[in-house]
Amino acid sequence: MSARGRVIVITGAMAAGKSTVADLLTMRLPKSVHIHGETFRRMVLNGRADMTPNPSPDAIAQLNMRYDLAAMTADRFSEEGFDAIVQDVILGKDLADFVKRIDSPERYLVVLSPSLSALEWQEEQRAKAGYVHLSAGALDEVLRRENAKIGYWLDCSSQTPEETVEDILANLDKAAV
């Protein structure tokens, strides 16, 4: 059996670059997997309750289930020696709670926090639709106001995705949680 892998969580507001950075980071590591938290949401074809500014109890329960599944999946891959890169929007008190869900002893958290103007520009350039009920600016406000200041907060506004990955790898010790 291989040595246990690390779990690296990448979060930030919509349009912060999480998917691109997580993909590039995963490709840089020799034995790794990219876990898209959003995938678990999309698996629900009937009965899905999406998050809104005033979420229903079902939406909150489904969000917690999504976070549970992402953490369990990351831990399972980690047990088999994979570095598991978990990428999702995790805001407010949910961030500290999510980190506690991960059992892997080597846990890291990177919060991509580009400027609001960079987020808005990136959102305009995107082909994919993010959260229909929430803007990147609204998510960024919650991130900055309510997220626990844990992990490595990275203003990647002036970085290319490749530079952001280099920054993360060079500062991974600062991301330990």
Show where each model-derived region lies.
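Conserved substrate/cofactor phosphate-moiety recognition/catalytic segment
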Residues: 23-69
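Conserved phosphate-donor/acceptor-positioning beta-strand/loop module used by diverse small-molecule
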Residues: 88, 103-123, 154
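P-loop (Walker A) phosphate-binding loop of NTP-binding proteins
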Residues: 13
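Glycine-rich phosphate-binding loop used to anchor ATP phosphates in small-molecule kinases
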Residues: 61-104
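Small-molecule kinase domains that catalyze NTP-dependent phosphoryl transfer to phosphate-bearing small molecules
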Residues: 125-170, 174-177
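Hydrophobic anchor at the beta1->P-loop junction of P-loop NTPases
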Residues: 10
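Walker A/P-loop
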Residues: 19
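ATP-binding Walker
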Residues: 16
